[in-house]
C-alpha cells in the first residue's frame, strides 16, 4: 500500500514521518520546493520534539518527498 500526504506543514510532515518510520510506503507532497528540499535532507522546517529523528528514520525506510 502507498500513502500520499498532501501538505507538509506541522500535521502533514509529522504524519508522513511516523507512517514511513513504521514501514508504510509514504509520499509527502508540498508546493514549496525549498521546504521539500530541507525535508529530503532530513531537516524539519519547524521544531517538534524527536521529529527530525523520526523523519530521518522514515527517509531511510520508505519516505519520498515531492
Tell what function each PLM region has.
Residues 1-66:
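Structural/interface elements that position substrates and couple domains in central-metabolism enzymes
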Amino acid at each position: 500500500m502507498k500513502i500520499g500526504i498532501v501538505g507538509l506543514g506541522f500535521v502533514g510532515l509529522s504524519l508522513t514521518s511516523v507512517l514511513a518510520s513504521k514501514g508504510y510506503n509514504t509520499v509527502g507532497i508540498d508546493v514549496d520546493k525549498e521546504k521539500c528540499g530541507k525535508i529530503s535532507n532530513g531537516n524539519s522546517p519547524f521544531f517538534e520534539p524527536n521529529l527530525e529523528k523520526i523523519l530521518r528514520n522514515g527517509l531511510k525506510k520508505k519516505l519520498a518527498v515531492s
